[in-house]
């Protein structure tokens, strides 16, 4: 009985210490001055009269690349399908204040961990539905393509379900964090499956720090059911990777099977259709988390570390 009490006290102490540490971080984050102004280029473009196009081009020169005749932009401004798309965007995003506040909170977290980061100019656009570039982040600019956040079932989308499931409004923030993360996590020269898993795992661990209020499902872009499947089958997945000697395998076919976006992961077993895509990404995330739980290393140092060292010091051991 005494042992139970002692263990409970120890557990309570660590939980208190962990929560207290998080509270201190969040208080420090809140105190960081960040002011985001979202420039609604989508509104400006579709609400500008054709005769005022020259003024718009002066205000937003970077959205009008040289070589395109004005007739291209005038056609887009007035085309019924483009205008219908703008109407659909306006139904959801006429007021962007809520998202602006969320973006400010994200950049406060970014500046807490990376103080040298400049606050970018933020622009919303309606583009060509390039789902590979839903968000574009540079040191100076952040561009959000709102036509790709109309809801997974929107009638305008003609893409596979595993892609459109992340066309929801709640994916805007995780997508911004992902775009930022690619500037802080360097792709490894090591081509092993383990190194590739930990590379994407680092990005997700960074999202843990930048988006503390965001669910794990939203951070990785899974449904709740897909996340639950990973959690319930973590031991099985890991055993499969070990038994098939995949960790130090440099076969690049493992990347599309287990890391790249896909409708399901390819174990080449009966369970494949039950699985979400990117199982290897999820495992890499758990290894990253395990390492940071078991080692006193700064976030910046962790992001620069070698995958093999991270794995060996992670003490990663999934539940059976």
Regions found by a protein language model. Name each.
Residues 251-320:
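C-terminal soluble interaction/assembly domains
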Residues 205-267:
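Acidic/His/Gly-enriched intrinsically disordered linker/tail segments
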Residues 2-10:
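Sec-dependent signal peptide recognition
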Residues 38, 104-107, 203, 207, ...:
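Extracytoplasmic/secreted envelope proteins and their assembly/folding machinery
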Residues 20-85:
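N-terminal mature-domain "stem" immediately C-terminal to a signal peptide or N-terminal signal-anchor/transmembrane
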Residues 15-18:
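C-terminal motif of bacterial Sec signal peptides marking the signal peptidase cleavage site
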Residues 46, 61, 65, 111-115, ...:
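Sec-exported extracytoplasmic/periplasmic mature domains
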Residues 82-230, 300, 304-307:
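Acidic/His-rich structured neighborhood in mature extracellular/periplasmic domains
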């Amino acid at each position: 009985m005494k042992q139970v009490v002692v263990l409970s006290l120890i557990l309570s102490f660590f939980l208190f210490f962990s929560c207290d540490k998080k509270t201190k971080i969040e208080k420090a984050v809140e105190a960081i001055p960040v002011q985001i102004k979202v420039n609604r280029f989508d509104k400006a473009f579709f609400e500008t009269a054709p005769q005022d196009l020259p003024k718009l081009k002066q205000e937003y020169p970077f959205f009008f690349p040289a070589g395109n005749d004005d007739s291209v932009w005038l056609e887009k401004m007035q085309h019924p399908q483009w205008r219908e798309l703008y109407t659909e965007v306006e139904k959801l995003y006429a007021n962007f204040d809520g998202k602006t506040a969320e973006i400010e909170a994200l950049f406060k977290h970014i500046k807490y961990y990376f103080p040298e980061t400049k606050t970018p100019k933020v622009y919303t656009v309606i583009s060509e539905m390039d789902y590979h570039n839903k968000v574009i982040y540079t040191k100076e600019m952040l561009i959000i393509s709102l036509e790709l956040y109309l809801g997974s079932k929107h009638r305008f989308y003609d893409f596979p379900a595993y892609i459109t499931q992340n066309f929801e409004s709640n994916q805007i923030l995780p997508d911004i964090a992902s775009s930022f993360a690619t500037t802080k996590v360097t792709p490894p020269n090591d081509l092993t499956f383990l190194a590739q898993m930990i590379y994407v795992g680092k990005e997700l661990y960074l999202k843990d720090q930048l988006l503390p209020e965001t669910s794990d499902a939203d951070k990785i872009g899974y449904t709740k059911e897909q996340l639950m499947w990973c959690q319930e089958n973590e031991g099985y997945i890991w055993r499969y990777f070990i038994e098939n000697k995949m960790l130090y395998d440099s076969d690049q076919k493992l990347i599309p099977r287990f890391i790249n976006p896909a409708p399901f992961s390819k174990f080449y077993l009966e369970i494949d259709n039950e699985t979400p895509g990117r199982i290897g990404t999820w495992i890499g995330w758990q290894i990253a988390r395990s390492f940071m739980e078991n080692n006193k290393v700064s976030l910046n140092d962790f992001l620069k570390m070698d995958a093999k060292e991270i794995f060996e010091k992670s003490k990663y051991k999934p539940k059976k």
